[in-house]
């Protein structure tokens, strides 16, 4: 939790006086500043407040936690990247630095184009199951043998799907399906 190491006399400002080359990393639920900085941070809270739970799950369903501790995992990866960048900077400058990562920030970053779309349009994103907003078809589909995943991530793959799997080359040039959005 932010502030604990300072109370123990082991905060970054104290340690950098002893060793100016120190790289000091901290991971918390909500960062060192702001209204929630003293609150405990758990993965499920980071997933909820970072927006991930609002876009995970079935369309029209309840907010759903990702199947793994994604906030914890991404927080660890982000702090690792920060430490490596700080080591590289120290090689150049000779100085250490503080690396601060919050689980919530990591989850916001993981929402990628969904967060950007909200900022751009003001529309609140909703869960869409296995679909992906920028690519279509990209989903699980029921077929005679059970379920199949189709992910035509670009036009070349879409054309291959139409020609070789669906045997429907007419769908490639049909105005209804010329770009990913109408294919939904």
Sequence positions of predicted segments:
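Rossmann-like NAD(P)-binding element
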Residues: 1-5
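Aromatic-enriched alpha-helical interface/lid elements that frame and gate functional surfaces
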Residues: 136-179
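Active-site-adjacent "lid/gating" segments in soluble enzymes
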Residues: 6-153
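A short, hydrophobic C-terminal helix/tail in secreted or cell-surface proteins
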Residues: 180-184
